[in-house]
Amino acid sequence: MSEKDNNLTPWQQKHLEYQKRKAEEAKKEKKANQPKKVHFSSPFLKSLPKTEKNFDDTRDEAESAELLEEGFETNNEETQSSEAPIENEKIIAQLEQLSQENEYEYEEEQIKRPSRFFSLFKGSAPLLKKMWPALAIVVLVFVGSLYLISPLSKISTFSVSGNANESSEQVALASGIQTSDSIFNILNNKEKIEATIEQKFPRISAVTINYHFPNRFEAIVKEHTNSVYVKRNDQTYLVLNNGYVITTPVDATKLEKLPVLQNFNDEEVKTFVNAYETLKPAIKSLMTNVTKTPTDATKDFIAIDMSDGNQVRVSLSQLADRLPYYPSVAKQVQAPQVVDMEAGIYTKPKAAYDAYLSQLSTSKSASISAQNAKKTDASSENTAQSTTTSSN
């Protein structure tokens, strides 16, 4: 048995043996149907006269015929034996092909064959189709009930991020959220919780509460930035970029590089901050000290000391409109200069401007004194006339 035969399955080997037996039976049947003797006519024999043929010649002819017949049969057997391996290989190839086809058909049958589970519901498709909506509702209610009574429906952690000045513990406490609260309750009151936190912490400008699966919440905090300082009664207070003044005094040794407003009330502080926050950082960084210098014409006139040595005088109500021109003006003058923006824009050396202000103040004081003297004289005359009239 060849190596290829050993690789056949038991069924293929039995089939091969059956094919071999059929081949041998066909061979025997073919041999049985053939004539036992084949007579060949020889040219040599034809050349001899028929009368000269004797018994010996007849015997020799018979023996020659038998030898030829045996040779013919031997050749046939050799031919059949040489063709046998070829036929076997063909049979093996056919068997392999047949086996592959059977396996393929078996796999297709297994795929097409419904499972036992689905066979249980055979014939109930119309009923299931009608009951499907009700079954879906029942399943959803069941799953929802399980979720509500499970720990997953309760908040597990609440974290705070983005806070620099307010502590996470204080923000969490102000939110009123506890670990035993329902997730749906927090989601329904999300905006209310955010507004509560913003109201309790003036430094916080916005709060966003985010939900993270499965039961975590995070409060993302955005704080107001520090804008300026305001000095009142020798105490310095921080002002946020929304104009809110922190009521706790700041240590004078720990001040940031921000402008300091001198004796501004809350309304004036908010007006200044609103305009200040619209300016470019390059201009804001130059401002150091701001004082109120009202005039008869401009009651909200202020003086802004700049770090380059100049001083800008402008009305508080026009700060956002006029101050952006300062950088171009500063390039054209040599400090220290006073840049007056009350009526138009003009510059004057600081010493000359201070002298002008001093002279203006003296003139104003003299005018006030003269007016007071006139009022005193008029009052004296009225008193004298009243005395004369009463004596008469």
Curated annotation (Swiss-Prot):
<keyword id="KW-1133">Transmembrane helix</keyword>
<comment type="similarity">
    <text>Belongs to the FtsQ/DivIB family. DivIB subfamily.</text>
</comment>
<keyword id="KW-0132">Cell division</keyword>
<feature type="domain" description="POTRA">
    <location>
        <begin position="153"/>
        <end position="224"/>
    </location>
</feature>
<feature type="region of interest" description="Disordered">
    <location>
        <begin position="1"/>
        <end position="87"/>
    </location>
</feature>
<dbReference type="InterPro" id="IPR050487">
    <property type="entry name" value="FtsQ_DivIB"/>
</dbReference>
<keyword id="KW-0812">Transmembrane</keyword>
<protein>
    <recommendedName>
        <fullName>Cell division protein DivIB</fullName>
    </recommendedName>
</protein>
<keyword id="KW-0131">Cell cycle</keyword>
<dbReference type="GO" id="GO:0043093">
    <property type="term" value="P:FtsZ-dependent cytokinesis"/>
</dbReference>
<feature type="topological domain" description="Cytoplasmic">
    <location>
        <begin position="1"/>
        <end position="131"/>
    </location>
</feature>
<feature type="transmembrane region" description="Helical">
    <location>
        <begin position="132"/>
        <end position="152"/>
    </location>
</feature>
<comment type="function">
    <text>Cell division protein that may be involved in stabilizing or promoting the assembly of the division complex.</text>
</comment>
<keyword id="KW-0472">Membrane</keyword>
<dbReference type="InterPro" id="IPR026580">
    <property type="entry name" value="DivIB"/>
</dbReference>
<dbReference type="GO" id="GO:0005886">
    <property type="term" value="C:plasma membrane"/>
</dbReference>
<feature type="compositionally biased region" description="Acidic residues">
    <location>
        <begin position="58"/>
        <end position="76"/>
    </location>
</feature>
<feature type="topological domain" description="Extracellular">
    <location>
        <begin position="153"/>
        <end position="392"/>
    </location>
</feature>
<dbReference type="InterPro" id="IPR005548">
    <property type="entry name" value="Cell_div_FtsQ/DivIB_C"/>
</dbReference>
<feature type="region of interest" description="Disordered">
    <location>
        <begin position="368"/>
        <end position="392"/>
    </location>
</feature>
<dbReference type="InterPro" id="IPR013685">
    <property type="entry name" value="POTRA_FtsQ_type"/>
</dbReference>
<feature type="compositionally biased region" description="Basic and acidic residues">
    <location>
        <begin position="14"/>
        <end position="32"/>
    </location>
</feature>
<dbReference type="InterPro" id="IPR034746">
    <property type="entry name" value="POTRA"/>
</dbReference>
<keyword id="KW-1003">Cell membrane</keyword>
<dbReference type="Pfam" id="PF03799">
    <property type="entry name" value="FtsQ_DivIB_C"/>
</dbReference>
<dbReference type="Pfam" id="PF08478">
    <property type="entry name" value="POTRA_1"/>
</dbReference>
<dbReference type="GO" id="GO:0032153">
    <property type="term" value="C:cell division site"/>
</dbReference>
